[in-house]
Structure formats: structure tokens, C-alpha cells
């Protein structure tokens, strides 16, 4: 009787261990990224509904909308790439946001600008964003 003995070199075992470790790492990363994407999708959907309810609802008064403009700005800055906007709409919204921020940062006697006229600056941008999230 003859016995055949397979001899594995130490380098082939190391290569196999490395490949196994890398594949496990890739699986873990895939799971983490996938769950993160799902969470961000759910967050985007929830924030979109909030924005649409706040700014798309004609029964919400102008002052409530003006008070919530920072939330709209934050939403647009975070999710602008997910909104289906034409290049012209995107440019219009970006210009309105820049103008709003410039006016908001302007101070008179050390006090930021007050009043509802700031809301009028980005009124068209609001309608574009609301249309995109609905």
C-alpha cells in the first residue's frame, strides 16, 4: 500500500488565509454599506415628507414657513444630489439659496436681518424643491 501525502507550502496557506480574510472583510463592508444606504433612504423619505407637508401645504402660514427655512436649507444641502431637478432648476435654487444666505448673514448694528422678506427671496426655490420631493 502506498500513501500519498499532500504537502502544502507555507506560502500557499498564507495566500489562502489572506484571501479568506479579505473576502470576509468585503462581506462585512458590504453589509455595513448596504444598511447605511437603507437608513439614509428612509431618512431621505421622511425628510422629504416633512418638507412637502411644511412648504407644500397652503394652510401653513408664511411665518411658520419662514421659521423653518433653515430646515429646508439643510435638507437641500444634504440631499440636493438626490432631487430630480433640471440643470436650470438646480441653478435657480442654488442662486436663490446663495442670495438668501448672503442676506441672512448681513448684519445691521450687530443684528441679523429680521422679517418675512427673506422668505420672498427663495419662494421660487421652495416651489421647485417641493415639486421635486412630491
Swiss-Prot record:
It is found in: Secreted. It comes from the Eukaryota. GO terms for biological process: cellular response to heat; cellular response to UV; innate immune response; response to bacterium; response to heat. Residues 1-38 form the signal peptide. Its main location: secreted. It holds the Pfam family Turandot. GO terms for cellular component: extracellular space. Keywords: Immunity, Innate immunity, Secreted, Signal. Belongs to the Turandot family. A humoral factor that may play a role in stress tolerance. This is Protein Turandot E. It comes from Drosophila simulans (Fruit fly). The gene is TotE.
Amino acid at each position: 500500500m502506498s500513501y500519498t501525502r499532500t504537502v502544502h507550502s507555507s506560502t500557499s496557506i498564507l495566500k489562502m488565509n489572506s484571501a479568506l480574510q479579505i473576502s470576509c472583510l468585503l462581506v462585512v463592508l458590504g453589509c455595513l454599506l448596504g444598511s447605511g444606504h437603507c437608513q439614509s433612504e428612509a431618512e431621505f423619505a421622511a425628510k422629504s415628507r416633512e418638507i412637502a407637508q411644511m412648504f407644500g401645504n397652503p394652510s401653513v402660514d408664511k411665518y411658520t414657513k419662514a421659521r423653518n427655512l433653515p430646515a429646508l436649507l439643510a435638507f437641500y444641502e444634504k440631499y440636493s444630489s438626490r432631487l430630480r431637478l433640471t440643470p436650470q432648476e438646480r441653478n435657480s435654487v442654488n442662486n436663490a439659496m446663495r442670495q438668501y444666505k448672503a442676506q441672512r448673514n448681513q448684519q445691521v448694528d450687530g443684528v441679523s436681518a429680521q422679517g418675512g422678506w427673506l422668505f420672498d427671496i427663495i419662494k421660487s426655490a421652495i416651489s421647485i424643491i417641493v415639486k421635486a420631493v412630491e
